[in-house]
Amino acid sequence: MDKCVITGHHFSVENMNHNNNNYDFDNKNNSIGGGGGGGGSSSSRSSSSRSSSNRSSSGSSGGSGSNSSSSINNIINSDNDFKTERKQTKSPPLTLPNIKTTTTTTTTTTTTTTTTTKNENISSSESENSSSRVGSPNCNKKVKKTKTITISPTGYNINSKDDINKFTTYGYTNEKSNARRDPKWINDIIERYNRLKSESLNNNYNGSSSNNNNINNINNNSNNTTSPCQSPSSNTATITSISSPTSSSSSLSSPSFSINNIVNQDVDENDGCDRMNYTLLSQNNNNNNNNNNNNNNNNNNNNNNNNNNNNNNNNNNNNNNNNNNNNNNNNNNNNNNNNNTNTNNNGDECIVKPISLIQNKKSGQRSLKTKEHKEILEALYRVTLYPTSEETKTISQILGMTFGQVKSSFRHRREKLSKSGLFSYAKNLKNCGKSTAPLDNFFENCKYLTTKETEEFAAAYDVSFEQIKNYFKGKRAKLNKLSSKAIQDKDNQDNDNNNSNNNENNDDSYSDEGLF
C-alpha cells in the first residue's frame, strides 16, 4: 500500500510491504488471527458479559484454532449487508500537482524507497550513478532505489534542512502530534512579525534623503500631525507613520518580507532592540530643532506679510488678512507639536507601542481578515495544522477572533490543501471505506477487547491499534453518559411523582367535619 508522508513541503511516498494478513471480507473460509492448528484445548476467559458457549472451547483432535478468531470471523461474516458494503475498487494513486521528478541522483529532500534483492553483478557505471546502493558486487544485498519527488508550492521556499528544524513540526503534516508544544511559540511568531515590520520601515527611512525645506513643507501643510509617542488605533494593524529628518515624503511603501523570515528568523535577545517596544531616542531632538526652525520661518513670513499690507491697496487687505490667519493657524499647529514633544525634553525614551491586531468581533460574525492577519495565520499554519484548544484560545485572543473562527480557519485550510493534494488526512475508521457494523455487534456482547482481539480488528480494517482501542473507549464513554442521563431523568421523574403524591395527600387531609 502506498502511504503518503508529508515532511515540510516535500513528499515521501514509501512502498511498504505489509504482512499478508489482510482480511478478505468476501471469503467465508478466512479467519482473523491464524488458521487451523493441531488438537488441543484452548483456554477460555470468564467474563460476566460473555456467554460460555461463545467464549469457551473443548479439546479435539482436529481443532480449528482459537475460538476468539472464529467468533470475530462469524460476527464479520454474519451480516449480508455488511458484505455488500465491503466490495470496493482499488483507489487510484495520489496525483500531485507541479511535480518535478529526477531519477539519476539522490537528494536529501524526499525519497521513494523500494527494497529488492540483487544476485547479478552491478556495473561500475550504475554504482557511480546511484549513490544510495549499499554493498559490493557478487553479494546478495538489499539495494535501495531512490526516486526524487519535489514539490514547490508558490510562496514557500525551503533553503536547507536547518529551516525544517526551527520548530517542533514544520510544514503541512497529516499527523496530530501528541507532544505538548510550548504555547510561547505563538507569541514568538507575533513578536517576530512586529519586529520585521518595524525593521523594514526603519530601513525605508534610512535609505531615503531629503532637506529641511521638505520637512518644513510637510509639517506646515499637514494639519493632522501625529506624535511619535502616539499609539496606533486598536482597530488597525499598521505602525503609525513617524516624521523623520531623513524621510522625503509623508507616505511609505508597504514593507516586503516573506513568511519564511517570520518563522525561521533567529532572535538575539541581546541585540539592543526590544521585540515588543521600539525606542526612538534621537528623534526627539530632531523634532524640537525642526519646530524651532518652523517658528522662525513663520515669524519671517508674518513680517513680510505686514510690509506687503502697507504697500498694497485696500482690495488686497482682505487677502493679506487671510494670509495672516493661515500663518497664525500654522503657528498654533507648531505650538501643539512643541507641547507634544516637551514631555521628552528631559531625556526620556519615546516608546512606540507595538502593532495591535485585536479587533472586536461578535460571535457568529464572519471574520474579516486583514493582510497582517493572513500573514500571521499563514505562519501559524506552517507550524501545525492541528492546534490544541489552548493554542486556539491564545490565537483568538491575539488576533481578536472568536474561538470558532480560528478553529474553522484551520479546518478550511486543511480542506483546501487536501483538495490540491498537498495534504492528506490520516486513515481512520471513518474514511477507511468499511462499515463498523461488526465492531458495533461485538460491542453489544462485550464492552472490552483483549490485546489479541484489538490487533485482529486493526489488521482487518487496516488501521492502527490505538484507533480500534479508542473506538471502543468512546462507545463506552457514550454509553456511560447515556446511562447516567437516564438514571438522572428517572430520579427526577420519581421526585416529581413523590411531590405530586404528597400534594394529593395534603389535599385529602382536610376534613369535611364542621362544614355542616
Curated annotation (Swiss-Prot):
Single Gene Ontology BP annotation: regulation of transcription by RNA polymerase II
Protein's cellular compartments: Nucleus
Low complexity bias: start-end ranges: 22-31, 42-59, 66-78, 101-132, 284-346, 495-504
Region Disordered, annotated ranges: 22-140, 200-256, 268-348, 483-516
Transmembrane annotation, as ranges: none
DNA-binding region ranges: 362-421, 424-483
Gene Ontology cellular component list: nucleus
Major subcellular location class: nucleus
Start-end of Acidic residues biased regions: 505-516
Biased composition (Gly residues): 32-41
Protein name (record): Homeobox protein 6
Gene source species: Dictyostelium discoideum
